[in-house]
Regions:
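Short, hinge-like loop/turn segments at secondary-structure boundaries
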Residues: 55-57, 99, 138-141
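Charged phosphate-binding loop/patch that engages nucleotide di/tri-phosphates or the phosphate backbone
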Residues: 115, 119-143
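Short, well-structured N-terminal submotif of metal-dependent ribonuclease cores
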Residues: 1-39, 51-67, 132-135
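Conserved beta-strand segments of alpha/beta enzyme cores
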Residues: 36, 77-79, 138-139
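Alpha-helix capping/helix-boundary segments
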Residues: 10, 43, 86, 126-128
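Active-site neighborhoods of divalent-metal-dependent phosphate/nucleic-acid chemistry enzymes
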Residues: 75-125
């Protein structure tokens, strides 16, 4: 198994004990932890932005969200991946396969996982493999 880049929705589920998918995400990570997990600037910023919104079901202050994420990423099983691919690079992204704005971040994160030789773990069932050159089913893990 290869390292899994966790989508923002998976980070939220893992790091929010009140999240509806917390147990499912936790059980998955327990099974997969030996392969490692990754975050990047997009997923880290997205986690903090969403969980600190007043409308989020269990909001926390920004400082607490950052602290929670820092604790989670301080483990040996975590890697930080720099955002090293571009959505504009036609060698990476098949633009015609981006069907809507809600797919943009998922496709980008899948492309980053492919570039890193890893997997993209998400709850989002609408990420099209065909939008990323070289992406195969083993690169995308829908929890």
């Amino acid at each position: 198994m290869s390292t899994a880049l966790l989508d923002i929705n998976v980070l939220l589920a893992l790091l929010d004990g009140d999240h509806v998918d917390h147990e499912r995400a936790r059980r998955w990570l327990e099974r997969e932890i030996q392969s490692g997990w990754a975050s990047c600037a997009i997923t880290e910023n997205g986690f903090v932005r969403i969980i600190s919104q007043p409308r989020y079901p269990s909001p926390v202050p920004v400082a607490q969200a950052v602290q929670r994420l820092a604790r989670a990423t301080s483990t040996e099983s975590h890697e930080f991946w720099p955002c090293s691919v571009s959505l504009l690079d036609e060698r990476v992204i098949e633009r015609d396969h981006l069907l809507g704005p809600r797919q943009v971040t998922g496709v980008y994160l899948l492309a980053l996982a492919v570039a890193q030789g890893g997997r993209f773990a998400t709850f989002d069932q609408s990420v099209p493999l065909s939008a990323v050159h070289g992406a195969r089913p083993e690169h995308l893990l829908v929890l």
